[in-house]
């Protein structure tokens, strides 16, 4: 999936996450996480984000994640909404989701 434009998904409310994405000129993933629960769940948050990006074959992006203690399922949903917005596709290929 190609990221064509910057996009935002989520809120800064307690129990939610706000994620910003922007395309990069390289194939790197620049991931910056700011979380109120980073010491306890930072590795799990990072793993979830990288898993979703790998699933949709996303490279060459900058991600800024402001986590306020969100659940894994919400993090995944916010990421999928963000990817759809940033790539300009109207819907994700749900049949490919497992």
UniProtKB/Swiss-Prot annotation:
Keyword Cytoplasm among UniProt keywords: yes
O-(phosphoribosyl dephospho-coenzyme A)serine modification, residue list: 14
Domain of life: Bacteria
Name this polypeptide is given: Citrate lyase acyl carrier protein
Cellular location(s): Cytoplasm
Organism: Shigella boydii serotype 18 (strain CDC 3083-94 / BS512)
Subunit field text: Oligomer with a subunit composition of (alpha,beta,gamma)6.
Record keywords, A-Z: Cytoplasm, Phosphoprotein
Functional note: Covalent carrier of the coenzyme of citrate lyase.
Family: Belongs to the CitD family.
One Gene Ontology CC term in the entry: cytoplasm
Coiled-coil spans in chain: none
Keyword Phosphoprotein recorded: yes
Transmembrane portions of the chain: none
Main subcellular location: cytoplasm
